Structure formats: C-alpha cells, structure tokens
Amino acid sequence: MKTLPITRYRFFQKIQPLSLLKKITGKTITGCLQVFSTSGTWSIYVEEGKLIYACYSERMFEPLYRHLGNLSPQIATLPKEINEQLRAIFETGIENQAIPNPDYLAICWLVNQKYISSSQAAVLIEQLALEVVESFLMLEEGSYEFIPESFLDDLPKFCYLNVRLLVEQCQQHGRVPEAFRREASSQEISSSTEHNQIPVNNRRSTKFTSPPHTQPKPEPRLPQINTNKSTEYSKRYASQPNTVNHGYSQTSATSTDKKIYTIFCIDENPIVLNNIKNFLDDQIFAVIGVTDSLKALMEILCTKPDIILINVDMPDLDGYELCSLLRKHSYFKNTPVIMVTEKAGLVDRARAKIVRASGHLTKPFNQGDLLKVIFKHIT
C-alpha cells in the first residue's frame, strides 16, 4: 500500500479539488481522501486509483433515498417502504455511534437482502459519486488528509469508477466552473475504447455497460437483517450467567430465510459484554455473554454460535487455550474465533496464529471496529 505525498493540512486554505483528485488516481493508491470545509466533509474512497465510494457528511442519506426512489420503478424487488426501513435500521438504530459510513452499510444490506443486485448497487454508487464529485469540484477553501486504511477495506466492493470520467460527466452537466473545465480538458481520454474498458491491474479490467464505467462485484456475504419489528429474540447476558437458553426463540412468525446470527462473547468484565450487546442490532444478532471461560467451553458446544469473541486474558482458561480446544473439535474448525486483547504486538499475533484464531479486536473498540471484524469473518 502506498501513502500519498499529500500533506495533511489542519488549517483551511485555498485548495484545488481537481488537483487532489489527480493525486489519488494512481494504480497503487488505496485509501480515503477526506476534505474538510465549514459546510461539511467529503470522503472519497479509492482502491488502486479507482473510486469505490464517495459521500458528503451533511447529506449522507438524503441522496441515497432520492436515487433509490428514482430506481424503484425499474426494480420490482424494491419495496415502497424501503426508505423507512433503512432509516429505522441505519439512521435511528446507530445514532451517536462511531460508524463512519452507515450509508455504505445500507447499500451492502440492500444487496444482501436481495432488494437490489450487485450491478444495481454499482449504478446507485455511481449516481451518488457523480453528485458528491460535482459538489466537491465547487469547493474553494478547506483542509484535507489522505488515510491509507478506511472503514470500507473489509466490506464488499461493487464497482471501480474512473475519476476522470466522473469529472467529464460533471462538465457535461454544465455545473462545473469554467476554470475546472479548462484544467480537465487537457486530461480528456482520446481513445474511445478507454470509455468502454479501463485496466485496473494485470488480473482485472473494468468493462462498462450501462452506466459506461461501472463494474459489478460478486454478491457480498453479510449478515441478513430481519426488519420485522414484532420479532423478539431471547438472549442471555453476563448478568444472568446460570440461565442458559440455547439458540433463540421467536414470539411471532417471521420469514424462514431471515437468519439471526449468534455471537458468543467471553469476557470477565460485564461492562464489555454489555457494550457488545448495545453495539449490535438485535434484529441481526443474538448475543450471548459469559464471564467464566470454563463454563463457556461447554456452552459453546451446545449453542454452536456463528462467531466467537474471546478475551485473551481470561482467568483459569485463557483465550488462546480456549481457542486451541475449540479448533480440536470438528464442528469448530472453521468457526470464526476473534481474540479480544488490549495488546496486539508481534508475540500476541504469533500466539493467535498458532492456535488458528481468525483475527483480533483491540481494546478499547467502538461500534465501527466491532462491525468491521464481524462483517469480515461471518458467513
């Protein structure tokens, strides 16, 4: 991964948006360009120089709802009340939580629920990107930084957009200042074939159909969300360590193709367990919290959770020992086991690798950190 030679400017100054866009179009550039102004923040995510998503902080969901409304007549699987569902789950449900791009999670959810296809998600992302880039090109003053790692790194990607072609489309709409048009005119693609195919690397090329530069990615594998508000799932937490309810029960009928993912958490600190419970939407996850690692081993065998979070510093039976024991059981050879630790040095990573842990989560963590590791490992 290459770090851009872009200085981090903390103070507002005159900026040239087109020049910043040029700097992130190199084939080895991956990360997020964030540009700050008095009106809001622009976040432009790129992978190998191609734009994969763009958003504006002050209007994150409004454009999404609007473009979904425009697409709904063409998509029979998109329900009329979809905006209300998204608002309840991804706006109200995560209010005041540290998730950088809940709008992108909403798009992933739409694909996972089969409301839209990956190619339709690509069209949606391009329309949003055009709107964001257009407003970004109007910016005259601000500050910026480039972050090599971003929230989208471990999430599904639906398209790779050519930034220059996006700028050209903005010009065609006639809403880009003349100065930007003159500067961009020297970069126009002379060969018509480049409008139809853009190489990303030696193994992949981005071919365009409609829209002309959108490449759908494979269907993402993310947790499915049950939006039936009348459904309640019984969960056992650390405050009730002796009441074991294996699996979950439903108080009303729901569609059989909606799965609730069971997350088994082992930590001697009830506060940590409660934080995990509060971070995870109970319409997606059934959380089981245990403070005793010895009891946890037998209960894991009974509940067969979809993902396991283990504090490595548990007394009696530490996280590494517990993970090693689980891996010896045929059922748990491939179950995601995440080591939760306050330190993630080379020695700790090596120990986790020896016991075949799936990954690690460093304390303290926020909701965004937790969702990233779960979305990365759950199937």
UniProtKB/Swiss-Prot annotation:
One of its GO terms (biological process) is phosphorelay signal transduction system. The gene is patA. It comes from the Bacteria. The modification 4-aspartylphosphate is found at D313. Controls heterocyst pattern formation. Required for the differentiation of intercalary heterocysts but not for terminal heterocysts. Gene3D superfamilies: 3.40.50.2300. Keywords: Heterocyst, Phosphoprotein, Two-component regulatory system. Pfam families: DUF4388 (PF14332), Response_reg (PF00072). The keyword Transmembrane helix does not apply. This is Protein PatA. Residues 262-378 form the Response regulatory domain. Residues 181-226 are annotated as: Disordered.
